[in-house]
């Protein structure tokens, strides 16, 4: 998390020099991407007049802020580059050196930083911790610093050395009649004690859960249940959750941080590739052999029809529609649903059965391309693949390839098999909101069972699929945009369990993050539909425009920005502007397999309507001002009473009343769980 620093004068000096244009070789190369150039020294050519003016002005500004003089052996160019890197104000852009005629220029890309006097930066620094704290409170997970583990390891090694020294000293003064067997027994007991002490120090967090009745889902083994079997399915991006694998976890996952996602280097940024073993995702359950499909052999019982993943496919289509509307392109013809399933990157190639009919794809990873604040031309390379990202005109080429060693498995009948492992990466939405009135792609199925199938394909947040004997002391992992969250102390878990036990309205929080869909209405007219792939979002209005070096001008993928559009009425425009200005802090929304949870960051009243409260189903409830977690939608209650609303409504500006129509309220937000949005 970036914090305020004392080097803001450096950024102010650079921005003033770039905007004024009074120095030779200093200017914006791409202002939207924050890439600028400064003069570089070419020792083979005669430097033009005024080459050193920029660096002399930089040294003068440095003296004015009380910094010491540079050594005689250092130049202004070297001091400028060193200060940029140490203050983390900019980094070198590749290629670093370009030429303007015969003169050399150095390229830098500015790193966005928070500013003390900027209200938007304050909002940015408030929203991300609020999101993380809400996730910690809901799931009873607290961040774990690796330094604590390193300290525990060093402490255990130090104690081990002390015990070894004491044992040698005792052996030196012992009588010669001591038998070798006794020494071996003493040494064995000492090593067992050391090993036990070390394990107690290293795994105290993982074994410290006490609220087993509330968090028992974190410790139970997954039960295979067809398409939703967590032993064979990856996540529909729960960005915090580890990829489940029947093999041992190879290492922590790496996810782009919000700051990294907003620093493109050119073209479409590369999607994030998770460094995990895909072979582990395809490993069969315990007691089953890994045999490929064949026309003669039986079809495994855990394979279901492709219709089970239709809700997920519709959500992916909606996300791509939202992405294409943001970059100003039309949605291509999707064609047959089979085009949505990508080919595998297998060295043997696809396995064809009789008739060349398509079968089941055991692991599919759909990666919607992230894009910068402005629309870019396609053609950026995909990270880790060495290939260029194709044009968005063909949807099938957008889909990533799997790493299955057998390739796509085929079967008879020409029916498409089930997608057993699907992974979707979050898309970074640009600062400009999508065009009002964007159409939403509907689905063509009616079965309510697909809602459960959609949720079942998402694995639990906190589970390591290791051996049964190692499950009790397994390191509980939980990732959220690159932040490693693990159980830290026992008292913290106890306090969270006690807090949730007192909240009668929140008796179940679930164990899976489920994507959300947000519909935005201004005076009864729908202006935007936001498709989320993270399971946790911050809904807020756009912050005021500022210089591109401000961190508030970056839009992380977990943020849903309300567009600023004009209304036909002058009074309505004024009311809408006032409402959006007061909604800059926003509301945090978390979707799980048990419902939708809200936490308001606002300082003025807001109201929501949902079915979570048994006594106030369909009635207005005020959103708490104390950053308190409130449940707005309950999945189990909706399943028992399906005639109710499928979403939670959030009203801004006016208190909802039955005597007013929708066009009376400035802003109304409908928040859906993705499977309920695509169900009808």
Swiss-Prot record:
Keyword line: DNA-binding, Host cytoplasm, Host nucleus, Host-virus interaction, Inhibition of host innate immune response by virus, Inhibition of host interferon signaling pathway by virus, Inhibition of host IRF3 by virus, Inhibition of host PKR by virus, Inhibition of host RLR pathway by virus, Interferon antiviral system evasion, Modulation of host cell apoptosis by virus, Transcription, Transcription regulation, Viral immunoevasion
InterPro entries reported for this sequence: Interferon_reg_fact_DNA-bd_dom (IPR001346), WH-like_DNA-bd_sf (IPR036388), WH_DNA-bd_sf (IPR036390)
Main location (coarse class): host cell
One of the protein's GO biological processes: symbiont-mediated suppression of host PKR/eIFalpha signaling
DNA-binding region: 7-103
Region annotation Disordered: where it falls in the sequence: 156-201, 220-257, 343-365, 403-423
Alphabetized Gene3D superfamilies for the sequence: Winged helix-like DNA-binding domain superfamily/Winged helix DNA-binding domain (1.10.10.10)
Gene Ontology CC annotations of this record: host cell cytoplasm; host cell nucleus
Entry GO MF terms: protein serine/threonine kinase inhibitor activity; transcription cis-regulatory region binding
Biased segments, Low complexity type: 168-188, 220-240
Subcellular location: Host nucleus; Host cytoplasm
Biased composition (Acidic residues): 191-200
Described purpose of this protein according to its UniProt entry: DNA-binding transcription factor that plays a role in the modulation of host immune response. Acts by interacting with host EIF2AK2/PKR and inhibiting its activation. In turn, EIF2AK2/PKR substrates including EIF2S1 or histone H2A are not phosphorylated. Inhibits type I interferon signaling by targeting host IRF3 during viral reactivation from latency. Attenuates the transcriptional activity of host FOXO3 via activation of the AKT1 signaling pathway, inhibiting FOXO3-mediated apoptosis.
Family to which this protein belongs: Belongs to the IRF family.
Quaternary data: Interacts with host EIF2AK2/PKR. Interacts with host USP7.
Protein name: Viral IRF2-like protein
Origin organism lineage: Viruses, Duplodnaviria, Heunggongvirae, Peploviricota, Herviviricetes
This protein's encoding gene: vIRF-2
